[in-house]
Amino acid sequence: MGLLGYFRSDIPKKSSAKLAKDRLQIIVAHEHSNAVCPAYLPEMQNEIIEVIRKFMKISNDDVKCEFSDNAEDDMSVLEVNITLPKNR
């Protein structure tokens, strides 16, 4: 084996385009997972509360909103829990 044999590898190397694509996908997935909640979420929550208030009396404390983002399934979930009054 010559001197250049030490620098060569039997493992096929990825092309620079493939390597760049893989790195970009990792960065995009990381940025997507760091997104806590969309900017429109507070406004949406207020509008949901206003629609429900047309039909029954509730306070802001009766509404719990939770936003979760699952990067694996490429799905976002907005869960809204409303404690309804006993006398509807």
UniProtKB/Swiss-Prot annotation:
Single GO biological process annotation from the record: cell division
Disulfide bonds: none
InterPro entries for this protein: MinE, MinE_sf
Keyword terms: Cell cycle, Cell division
SUPFAM superfamilies in UniProt: Cell division protein MinE topological specificity domain
The keyword Transferase appears for this protein: no
Highest taxon in the source lineage: Bacteria
Gene3D superfamilies membership: Cell division topological specificity factor MinE (3.30.1070.10)
Family note: Belongs to the MinE family.
Function: Prevents the cell division inhibition by proteins MinC and MinD at internal division sites while permitting inhibition at polar sites. This ensures cell division at the proper site by restricting the formation of a division septum at the midpoint of the long axis of the cell.
Record-given protein name: Cell division topological specificity factor
